[in-house]
């Protein structure tokens, strides 16, 4: 699945840049009352990037598991008044623990950190997204 084709993601205006990163252009459609990027639009970009890094990290599980966002923490550092880019990351330890849990139990939790940066490279927002992922029982979906 291409995350930028998810209807909500399209509606928000999240795009992929030439470096393959997810970004949110600065335009009136995502502005708040202060004419900066709305908090919910920043959250949408960060959450989408967190899901995509898991999809890329575990591409062999696509169609075999259901990922659900279980918990999130977000901190807005400075107003975003330019295009912003998402920079997601997962620690090697978390990746290893996830692989072990999903293999042994058929379900696992994993946390993804995301930094949003403006065109000057300044941090506008940070977030941690905890995903619950469970294997699909045969015949359960599709």
Regions inferred by a protein language model and the residue ranges of each:
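Catalytic strand-loop segment that frames the active site of acyl-thioester-processing enzymes
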Residues: 6-37, 56
